[in-house]
Amino acid sequence: MHNMSDIIEQYIKKLFEDTNEDVVEIRRTNIAQRFDCVPSQLNYVIKTRFTNEHGYEIESKRGGGGYIRITKIENKDETGYINHLLQLVGPSISQQQAYYIVDGLLDKSYINEREAKMIYAVIDRETLKMDILSRDIIRANIIKRLLHVINYY
């Protein structure tokens, strides 16, 4: 059984498929009513599963006519998407942000599930046992190197 976040994520991804567009606009209240959940549940899904690292841009307007506009960052070639991810990685990166990048690579089939699990193991805070700043710098270097390898090999 999937949890509510998974169900909402799949629904939004299906909207992209059904409309065959790179932009989907949804209303918080409509989604909350459809799935009998609170709007904050939708916010959680958007903030964790439709991030830049996953290949999406979000525009949000609150209030009476509020909406969430989700735009797929479509790069027609692998190099464009990888370069987009490289721009997102600064001199350091948190474990969660790095996981989002790996999730995006997996989602777009640049890596398989086994490779994703190996990458998670390498960039995990339990593997990189050191002070937070050093850990985040090393993690960023690992992710950048990984992206370069995907880009050029």
Curated annotation (Swiss-Prot):
This is Transcriptional regulator CtsR. GO terms for molecular function: DNA binding. InterPro entries: CtsR, CtsR_C, CtsR_C_sf, CtsR_N, CtsR_N_sf. GO terms for biological process: regulation of DNA-templated transcription. Disulfide bonds: none annotated. Negative regulator of clpC, clpB and clpP transcription by binding directly and specifically to their promoter region. It holds the Pfam family CtsR. The keyword NAD does not apply. Belongs to the CtsR family. The keyword Zinc does not apply. Keywords: DNA-binding, Repressor, Stress response, Transcription, Transcription regulation.
